[in-house]
Swiss-Prot record:
Disulfide bonds join C104-C345. The active site is at E91, C345. Belongs to the radical SAM superfamily. RlmN family. Its main location: cytoplasm. It is found in: Cytoplasm. This is Dual-specificity RNA methyltransferase RlmN. The gene is rlmN.
Length: 374
């Protein structure tokens, strides 16, 4: 069996090297070559013994995901569409800013949560990504951007957010080794504060992540009460808001930051009224023993045809943000980036899936016609 070495964190790679009869320090060397230097050719790895390089050539590989398309926005945002096979594709987005470079990474092909305002959720769920498929997005983005920008080997991506396609905590087994590789000083060397997992609220896995790999946490809240959140985020029927907020408080005991970020997609006439802001204020004040324990990130909705939803007017978003801020809650409004390259997460991948399904339908129709010919 030929093994993709992107599928391992350092401990996993060490175990693999031991199976080959090698010492652990060889895994550390190999890990650095892969993740810090972006090497995919074992012959490039000059400090590895030739005997090990020959072993690896026979049983392993370092393979990124095929890139279907790359779109570069006028504001510098880059979106890649990666082929994960079976007619599925996933997206990763690089967002450059003055003081950081953030990569938004996907964890699943499709998503089973089915949030009403999410383009990915409307596609349905295909499968979980492997650890290697998650890391391959970072590996490709980091090293292709280094070459393009001519950084001389300096790191381009300073922050990773698991906010692409899929619910990360429903792919827990693959997620945690990927996070560990991002944090490892022999890998990407990112701090726990600079890696964020965004979840729609898988309560048991929030608790588990706090013990296994506590990074920064963002929660897709989007509503101040269960009645409103149930149809927007169907997972809320299983883990209602009070259970979710309890889990957030428990997570803070282990988190690298002293706050949870609540993401709140602003939907015209749905969840953007002053009464909704006041309900959020009540939720926040009921917890935290008077201390500041969360912040809100208000997100302008990226419309797509199947949603039946509209973006809240800018003036209403400003008013909503002011109500929260005046109550002492740190509140930001996310800048829209990459509007000219299909900004809504999942739209490009959805186009691929739609074309694949159309081709399959045409193939079935041709088969039926051929069978009917006497």
């Amino acid at each position: 069996m030929n093994t993709n070495l992107l599928d391992f964190d350092l401990d996993g790679l060490a175990a693999y090297c031991e199976q080959l009869g090698e010492k652990r320090f060889r895994a550390t060397q190999l890990f650095r070559w892969i993740h810090q230097r972006g090497a995919s050719d074992f012959d490039q790895m000059s400090d590895l013994a030739k005997s090990l390089r020959e072993k690896l050539k026979a049983c392993a590989h370092i393979t990124a995901l095929p890139v279907l398309t790359e779109h570069v926005s006028a504001d510098g945002t880059v979106k890649w569409l990666f082929d994960v096979g079976g007619g599925d594709a996933v997206e990763a987005v690089f967002i450059p800013e003055d003081d950081r470079g953030t990569l938004c990474v996907s964890s699943q092909a499709g998503c089973a949560v089915g949030c009403r305002f999410c383009s990915t959720g409307h596609q349905g769920f295909s499968r979980n990504l492997s650890t290697g498929e998650i890391l391959a997005q970072l590996w490709y983005a980091e090293h292709s951007l280094r070459k393009r920008l001519g950084t001389g080997g300096e790191r381009v991506i300073s922050n990773v957010v698991m906010m692409g396609m899929g619910e990360p905590l429903q792919n827990y087994t693959a997620l945690v080794p990927a996070l560990r590789a991002m944090l490892d000083d022999h890998g990407y060397g990112l701090s726990r504060r600079r890696v964020t997992v965004s979840t729609s609220g898988v309560v048991p896995m929030i608790d588990r992540l706090s013990q296994d790999c506590a990074v920064a946490m963002a929660v897709s809240l989007h509503a101040p009460n269960d009645e409103l959140r149930d149809p927007l985020v169907p997972l809320n029927r299983k883990y209602p808001i009070h259970e979710l907020l309890d889990a957030c408080e428990r997570y803070l005991e282990f988190a690298p930051r002293d706050f949870i970020t609540f993401e709140y997609c602003m939907l015209d006439g749905v969840n953007d009224q002053p009464e909704h802001a006041r309900q959020l204020i009540e939720l926040v004040r009921a917890r935290g023993d008077g201390r500041s324990w969360c912040k809100f990130n208000l997100i302008p909705f990226n419309p797509f045809p199947a949603s039946g939803l509209l973006r809240s007017p800018a003036a209403r978003v400003t008013e909503f943000a002011s109500l929260l801020s005046n109550a002492g809650i740190v509140t930001t409004v996310r800048k829209t980036r990459g509007d000219d390259i299909d900004a809504a997460c999942g739209q490009l991948a959805g186009d691929v899936k739609d074309r694949t399904r159309a081709a399959e339908r045409m193939a079935r129709q041709r088969t039926i016609v051929l069978k009917q010919v006497p």
